[in-house]
Amino acid sequence: MPRHNKKDSTSGASQRQLRVAETVRHAIADILAQGHVHDPVLEGHLITVPEVRMSADLKLATIYVMPLGGRDTTDVIDALDHNRKFLRGEIARRVNLKFAPDIRFRADERFDEAERIEKLLRTPAVQRDLAPDSDES
């Protein structure tokens, strides 16, 4: 009977990936909150880090960020990309891994998606479908 060592793509991240991702998330959130990055764009924004995803080999961290208020997202992502080398070094000092993960930043769009769904649920057509029928008795 053949054994399959590769993970099924639907099974999600391993416990180690999740643990390392959470450690990296805390480290990058602390770095940004304490103002260690001297960049005028970043100094003018409070940045939340809701999620970090690690690659299977733990060599790539995709960091999802959102400026508080959701404004200037592209400017913030560009500033973080510009300071990527410094941030990677800070993460390496704070997280005990064999290799410092390469990092990339992405905008967290879950808030926008939740708002879109909320608006959709408030449309008259959906409200009509959700209303209890008064004809049923």
From Swiss-Prot:
UniProt entry keywords in alphabetical sequence: Cytoplasm, Ribosome biogenesis
Pfam families to which the protein is assigned, alphabetical: RBFA
Molecular function terms from GO: ribosomal small subunit binding
Keyword Cytoplasm: yes
Cell compartment(s), UniProt: Cytoplasm
One GO CC annotation: cytosol
Gene Ontology biological process: maturation of SSU-rRNA
InterPro entries in the cross-refs: KH_dom-like_a/b (IPR015946), RbfA (IPR000238), RbfA_dom_sf (IPR023799), Ribosome-bd_factorA_CS (IPR020053)
NCBIfam families found in the cross-reference section: PRK00521.2-5 (NF001802), rbfA (TIGR00082)
Family per similarity comment: Belongs to the RbfA family.
Function: One of several proteins that assist in the late maturation steps of the functional core of the 30S ribosomal subunit. Associates with free 30S ribosomal subunits (but not with 30S subunits that are part of 70S ribosomes or polysomes). Required for efficient processing of 16S rRNA. May interact with the 5'-terminal helix region of 16S rRNA.
Subunit annotation: Monomer. Binds 30S ribosomal subunits, but not 50S ribosomal subunits or 70S ribosomes.
Protein name per UniProt: Ribosome-binding factor A
Native species: Nitrobacter hamburgensis (strain DSM 10229 / NCIMB 13809 / X14)
